[in-house]
């Protein structure tokens, strides 16, 4: 198996300027099979008919469904679509990737974090940006250095991770331990995430496999 065999679906804003689309774009650029789902051109994203999305067909046979938590702030329809995609995707055997970043209005972090917590058991890879780590640290009243480990232990998420471009360092908390890896290249956080999820399906789930995926 190689990256060209990895299938990734992302859902997000039709303007294609959100984190889900960025991950999608990075995955596509390194050779994964990708598809982006959004509303029709003549629809408003906030109110589009999300029932028209055939999630069973769209998620059948894929490895990952990528969402950005900020999407739920864009209207009732996007929020419902995120939830439906996760539910049907899980039934079809897809694994969920959730990106958490600080919204344009920082006060909304509590809203998106509440949504993530409500869906935490459906998420397989939870990626938290450096900015969001600080915000969640304040919300949860725990040290920044403990956020990833605490969230993984509370929610039993298989992979909780972050990447610092300045430090060129990836941090991953997983079911049997934790890994801190320095990358040779100075890359963007979502590019690191894309490389990680593209390698993870065939790198293995143990420490060696996860470290290998971290350095993809």
Which stretches of residues belong to each language-model region?
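Ribokinase/PfkB-type carbohydrate-kinase core domain
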Residues: 1-216
């Amino acid at each position: 198996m190689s990256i060209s065999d990895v299938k990734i679906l992302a859902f997000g804003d039709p303007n294609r300027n959100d984190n889900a689309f960025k991950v999608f774009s990075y995955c596509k650029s390194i050779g994964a099979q990708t598809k982006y789902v959004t509303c029709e051109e003549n629809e408003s994203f906030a109110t589009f008919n999300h029932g028209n999305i055939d999630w069973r067909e769209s998620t059948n046979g894929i490895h990952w469904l990528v969402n950005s938590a900020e999407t739920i702030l864009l209207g009732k329809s996007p929020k419902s679509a995120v939830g439906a995609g996760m539910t049907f995707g899980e039934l079809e055997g897809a694994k969920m990737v959730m990106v958490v970043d600080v919204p344009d209005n920082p006060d909304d972090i509590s809203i998106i974090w509440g949504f993530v917590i409500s869906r935490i058991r459906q998420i397989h890879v939870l990626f938290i940006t450096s900015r969001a780590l600080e915000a969640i640290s304040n919300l949860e009243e725990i040290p920044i250095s403990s956020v990833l480990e605490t969230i993984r232990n509370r929610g039993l998420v298989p992979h909780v991770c972050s990447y610092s471009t300045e430090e060129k360092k990836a941090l991953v908390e997983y079911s049997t331990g934790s890994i801190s890896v320095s990358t040779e290249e100075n890359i963007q956080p979502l590019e690191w995430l894309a490389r990680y999820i593209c390698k993870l399906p065939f790198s293995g789930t143990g420490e060696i496999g996860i470290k290998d995926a971290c350095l993809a």
